[in-house]
A protein has these predicted regions:
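A short helix/loop element that forms part of the nucleotide-sugar donor recognition site in Leloir-type
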Residues: 45-60
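Carbohydrate-associated surface elements
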Residues: 17, 38
Length: 249
């Protein structure tokens, strides 16, 4: 590993966290280039609420403010905390709803809690066909990226890019890593520390009470995708690195 780092003219990594990791091993910063794994910016787009068929299919109220989680409903996603927040918001902010899209090992327990606590502000939806992915990520006014503490320190979940591609702000309750820097640096969401229930609840309320900010963050998220995550941007960065290395020989 060290031999490779020492003799390479340039090293391409897929995230700022990977860059920090190899810099800690003594690799000079000017030797490292970050090129994100690209996404298909046309696979997930914003579907206006009045044209989103899933609102009709699952009897969702188009006048409400929704936060949405789409993905694995498992043991590490901190669903208990999320449902506690929704229990509190049901009393204080009845116009805020949660849409849960997905399957997983903890889904039955989630359904039991929703029924036990009469969480009428929570709607559970099964995974949808891939061709409806834009409809799915356009259900919420904001998209959720959540985990229990200690689970996500070294990763940015891929659903982050889908949320941003749909022009939705990201509400992250996650371990501190590159995701925090992306959301803050590009003003495309709100980051709270994994497990901090009150901070997370306040982030939901903040976007609910400021729809202009919510839309701004969503627009900025889409811009980040277009500026950094398209195939065209990614491949051009590879070409630029190759040209630089070859030109120096």
């Amino acid at each position: 590993e060290n031999f490779t780092y020492k003799h390479a003219d340039k090293i391409i990594v897929i995230s700022e966290d990977f860059k920090k990791n190899i810099m800690a091993k003594g690799v000079p910063e000017d030797k490292i280039v970050v090129v994100y794994n690209w996404v298909d910016q046309n696979a997930v787009i914003d579907i206006p609420r009045d044209k989103n068929k899933l609102f009709d299919k699952y009897q969702l109220d188009r006048s409400k403010f929704y936060i949405e989680y789409s993905g694995n409903i498992g043991l590490t996603q901190n669903m208990d905390m999320l449902l506690e927040v929704m229990k509190e918001l049901k009393t204080t902010h009845p116009d805020i709803g949660l849409v849960l899209v997905g399957e997983g090992a903890y889904k039955a327990q989630v359904e039991e809690i929703v029924k036990r606590d009469n969480l009428t502000n929570v709607t559970m939806i099964p995974f949808q066909p891939y061709e409806d992915i834009s409809y799915v990520f356009s259900l919420g006014d904001a998209g959720l990226v959540i985990s229990k503490p200690g689970v996500g320190a070294n990763s940015v979940p891929s659903k982050t890019w889908s949320i941003m591609s749909a022009s939705r702000p990201v509400l992250a309750n996650f371990d501190e890593n590159e995701l925090k820097d992306i959301l803050a640096g590009n003003e495309c969401g709100i980051f709270t520390k994994a497990g901090d229930k009150e901070a997370f609840k306040q982030s939901v309320i903040k976007l609910y009470e400021n729809r202009d900010l919510c839309m701004k963050y969503g627009t900025n998220g889409r811009k980040f995708v277009m500026d950094n995550l398209t195939r065209e941007v990614g491949t051009q960065k590879y070409v630029d690195v190759i040209k630089e290395v070859c030109g120096g020989k």
